[in-house]
Curated annotation (Swiss-Prot):
InterPro entries: Kri1, Kri1-like_C. Residues 364-384 have a biased composition (Basic and acidic residues). The modification Phosphoserine is found at S222, S225, S476. Residues 1-36, 83-117, 177-200, 353-384 are annotated as: Disordered. Required for 40S ribosome biogenesis. Involved in nucleolar processing of pre-18S ribosomal RNA. GO terms for cellular component: 90S preribosome; nucleolus; nucleus. It is found in: Nucleus, Nucleolus. It comes from Schizosaccharomyces pombe (strain 972 / ATCC 24843) (Fission yeast). This is Protein kri1. Belongs to the KRI1 family. Coiled coil: none annotated. It holds the Pfam family Kri1_C. PANTHER family: PROTEIN KRI1 HOMOLOG, ZINC FINGER, ZZ TYPE. Residues 96-111 have a biased composition (Acidic residues).
Amino acid sequence: MPRKKSAAKKAREALVQKKVINSNVPTDKKSIDQLQENVTSKSHLLEESSSEDEEINSFQINEEYAKRFEHNKKREELQKLEAKYGEQMANGVDGEGSDESSSEEEEDSDGELVTPEVDAAILRMIVKIRNKDPDLYDSQQKYFDEVEKDVQGSLKSKDGFRSVTLKDYHRQKLLSGEILDAEEDEPMPNDANPTHVEEQERLRKETIAAFHDVNGNKDAVSNESDEDGDFLVKKEKTKKQLEEEEHGYERFLLESAQSKEARKVLEDLSSSYVKQRPSVLVNTEDDENGIKPSDEDFLLKYMMNRGWRTSNTKQPSYEEIIDEVDAENRFDEDAEEFENKFNFRFEEEAGSQIVSHPRNVADSLRRKDDSRKRARDRKKERLEEASQKRLEEVNRLKNLKRKELEEKLNQVIEIAGSKNIDVSKLDLDEDFDPEKWESKMSEIFNENYYEEDSAKKPEFGDDIDIDDIAQVDNGSEDLGSIENKTVEDTGNREKSKKSLRKDIREKKRKIDEYVEEKYGVPEAVIVKNSKFRYQQVAPETFGLDILDILNASDADLNNYVGLKKMTPYRTPEEIARDKKKYGKKKRLREWKKQVFGK
């Protein structure tokens, strides 16, 4: 398969052909053939040259030069970093470590770095200022350079001192073997009970110690009391020790002053020398400025005794300790509250609570829309009016029926001629049935009716029988008997009135019962379109107790008493019959034995 020409070769061939065509060459066949041979030979030369170019383009990496270049690059980068961050990066100390070391440095709030030399230099400068020394006006004069160098040297020496921790101390003791030797020297503890002699010796020592405690002499048992554990007792300082501490720094300055000049200045300014001779700081301008010697002594005492330092000799009271603890707790609470407010400053207040609003807002301008409520009220009023109207119509119907029935019954009683007729058996509005009518008539007009009719007293006319009157006038009865008869007649009349009223009430009651039964309207018809009302049903267990009902299954209960026996529409006679039938104790015992096995 022939090799395809590249784009560069095609471009070169096209360029050569273009030059050949543009040149003044002959157009005969021989010359053209020669020209083609030249072109092919040149194309072969171009192919050879391109292959040589490809060999030249394939290069190799010089490893020695690459190593030297990388080494120089690293040195250049190292120099840049050292110039930017200093020598700390070269020594392996980064900026964070320096920050931590600087943050760990405590602030010199008590002036611990103020050495005696520094105090001497300060006091020397005060003397020169008060005396207006001309050297102060020399700008090249430096007073604190040497002192600062000494302080820096002392700081470096302190930094160079390596603190020994408890862990290092124990490691050193273990390596030296001192702890092992001490353990070997210690006697082995006696776990057994003490002997009688040891017990007596211990009791004797306790008695002696108690005797010395009573007499106030505790020196004899000081060693034993120390062994009891009360050896960490704070030592109370005497008045002399407090005075020595107060003036101790003054003596410390005098003892620790290294240069003779500093010692001389401190001796001159010492409070002990101030009492013996006039002060060195005396100036004629003090009297003019109102400066008193007492003020000068106060200044010297303040400087010499380090008055700016707080005294720790005073023991805080219980109230002060409690107040300090409370103050710390309040500070922590305030800090926590501030932090919470700051962290949640963009959140809404009470965001976790659901905001509720009242249904009836007093100050709201919203128009009340209670049209549906008013419609319900109107409907309720219409129903109540209709129910009241229906009830009035029923009552009017009852009254009319009562009057009509009374007229009919009065007519029947008047025709029958007897007041003891049972009118409750009569139904004057029902359809006429000859057989029922005959049976009711036979019940009403029975033997009692005819016996009452025969026993009825005869009625007399308006004519008066003279014979009867003559017999009364001519009789032998006295006035007492006549009065007794009059009283009896009066009592009979009262009884007849009572019986008459009783008959009227009984008649009215029977008529009302009859009208209510025949023409009475039930309450459900009167109160129409009302809500459903449950019917009150008397509870009945048929001899079962609560545990039997709860423990038994529905099938067992239905087997004992069916649900049909619990319907509310059953008549009282049916309820009484079922209660008598299903409430028998024998049947209940058999059912319990069958269900519960007892």
